[in-house]
Amino acid sequence: MSNRRETRKAAQDFIDNLKPLRRPNSEKIFIEGSRPDIQVGMRQIHQTDTRIVNTRGEETFEANPPIKVYDCAGPYSDPNADINVRRGLPKLREGWILARSDTEELNSASSNFTQQRLADDGLDHLRFDVLPKPRRAKAGKRVTQLHYARQGIITPEMEYIAIRENMARDEVTDEQLNRKKPGEAFGALVSKPITPEFVRDEVARGRAIIPANINHPEAEPMIIGRNFLVKVNANIGNSAVTSSIEEEVEKLVWSTRWGADTVMDLSTGRYIHETREWIVRNSPVPIGTVPIYQALEKVNGIAEDLNWEVFRDTLIEQAEQGVDYFTIHAGVLLRYVPMTAKRVTGIVSRGGSIMAKWCLSHHQENFLYTHFRDICELCAAYDVSLSLGDGMRPGSIADANDEAQFAELETLGELVKIAWEYDVQTIIEGPGHIPMQLIKENMDKQLEHCAEAPFYTLGPQTTDIAPGYDHFTSGIGAAMIAWYGCAMLCYVTPKEHLGLPNKEDVKQGLIAYKIAAHAADVAKGHPGAQIRDNALSKARFEFRWEDQYNLGLDPDTARAYHDETLPQESAKVAHFCSMCGPKFCSMKITQDVRDYAASLENAARSEADSVQTLEVGAAESYSKAESYARAGMDKMSATFKQTGSALYSETHVEAALSTEKEPV
């Protein structure tokens, strides 16, 4: 069997046998809002107790509280969920949408292309099993979350988001877990608990969006804005040469498991329409697309043959399927194209290059720009958010922050204000390839020109020397720009610039970007962001190995790395790892010093006849503790020299494992 067939069969088996995805020592919990139908899912990680031995050798245990973390997997992480990919996910928001009474169900699809696909019996074997009827706003109505927010309405989606963003952090009362370093938020408002009113106000101001198409009721409400947790997008999609519907659905589920807050379907191959239907119906997160890709397929890949009518029909097709946000390259203007002539890498955006070619071939202005108000009117009828694409983004650090890039950014700032006239939620896309010293300028200019609309960047990649490792090179820039105020990061996988990512590539890209997003939340001083760090650090210091794994982003990998050198069960409770061994573990030495100092202080207290005697005894105890610590360090120093002065020596580990008699 060929590799392609094996991959497709594996994906088919994954779908056929899909069960809720479990994490070790975790459970799915739900926090109820102001009404029973607002049930906000989170993941709760249970910890083991801390073992405490007093000076008399008596053992006690101190409980460690469970840690709640943000969960993007929806029903895929709920052990009670009935998962059936052919039926799709439960329609979480359907009741909320119907209760507003401002939409209507259509008897049939409005898109000519959709009607043609449905009439083609040859596609029946690819079609999603249960196709819902599409909905649209009633005549004269706008059904966007921005419209409701401006009317002063707090929707169930907004309340859901407030609960989700807070993650019940007010339940954490442990002083050690609540410690955090002062943050630098660069003007972001991140110091207070999130309330439904705060969510409404941020959306009303255009500083945040809730991507939530009325035809995607399966999606759990989430928010994108710099005053909220930094979000991460994952790209999936088939191409003309590889991948299948089964593989893309598998990658969707896989993406949500590893923390994708949104997913963009960038399919460019056959069966784009059918693939997208499967993805939307099974997605608990918002789905984005670049409609120009499919429009180009409809004109046989000839950019010059594109026109407004084909593109408009594509927007309607995708909006009625449930796509939550469109990337539109309306800022690629005819007069900007010559600005890229002297670039090292020219125009690297697929959408940008398509529209640049169209503009030059017709010597006319970009039809996405001239029809932008029509696009907004259409989006307002379905609550499709706009992601204004950066078609002029730099494709190398040599082209960073040039005239073409910033000219387009100013145009995007003009377009976002037009979108707001139609109550259309809007975010701005950003680069790209930017060296570290130029990253902040990008964020500053975006805030200046785009009226604080959320920024959404691809990286940026900080160096061009590492093909195969661009999830690292871009993760550096992603952490920086998110700290400065970027609201959502588009992940980059190890296959960037090289090929279509597989499952493992998707995981690696997401882990890298979840690290970047979380690091930015901590740096901004986001309330509660550091709780998980503190819990893991405490577990590490107390040698609670299983808790260390489970509190991490990737427990399986952490456990596997530990077990490569210390596979024994006894090593799961040992007070050392394979890096330093039992004799050189800094944390174990620190614990020994603490314990000895405490024992001497207790002895001094018991012998004291007066307060003065107690004070003198305690001082002497600490002095003795220092002497003990010094003696211990001297002994370790001598041993270190005897073993050849190697900083990290496996000799210590092998010696520890060769005998069970030596205490650890």
From Swiss-Prot:
Cofactor binding notes: Binds 1 [4Fe-4S] cluster per subunit. The cluster is coordinated with 3 cysteines and an exchangeable S-adenosyl-L-methionine.
InterPro entries, A to Z: ThiC, ThiC-associated_dom, ThiC/Bza_core_dom, ThiC/BzaA/B
Pfam (any one): ThiC-associated
Cofactor needs: [4Fe-4S] cluster
Record-level GO cellular component terms: cytosol
Keywords annotated in UniProt: 4Fe-4S, Iron, Iron-sulfur, Lyase, Metal-binding, S-adenosyl-L-methionine, Thiamine biosynthesis, Zinc
Reaction(s) the record says it catalyses: 5-amino-1-(5-phospho-beta-D-ribosyl)imidazole + S-adenosyl-L-methionine = 4-amino-2-methyl-5-(phosphooxymethyl)pyrimidine + CO + 5'-deoxyadenosine + formate + L-methionine + 3 H(+)
Positions bound to [4Fe-4S] cluster: C577, C580, C585
Positions bound to Zn(2+): H433, H497
Domain of life, source organism: Bacteria
Binding locations of substrate: N235, M264, Y293, H329, S349, R350, G351, D390, G391, M392, R393, E429, Y456
EC number: 4.1.99.17
Gene Ontology molecular function terms on file: 4 iron, 4 sulfur cluster binding; carbon-carbon lyase activity; zinc ion binding
Top EC class for this record: lyase
UniProt-listed GO biological process terms: thiamine biosynthetic process; thiamine diphosphate biosynthetic process
Pathway: Cofactor biosynthesis; thiamine diphosphate biosynthesis
S-S pairs: none
Family note: Belongs to the ThiC family.
HAMAP family the record matches: ThiC
Subunit structure: Homodimer.
Function: Catalyzes the synthesis of the hydroxymethylpyrimidine phosphate (HMP-P) moiety of thiamine from aminoimidazole ribotide (AIR) in a radical S-adenosyl-L-methionine (SAM)-dependent reaction.
Protein name per its UniProtKB record: Phosphomethylpyrimidine synthase
Gene of this entry: thiC
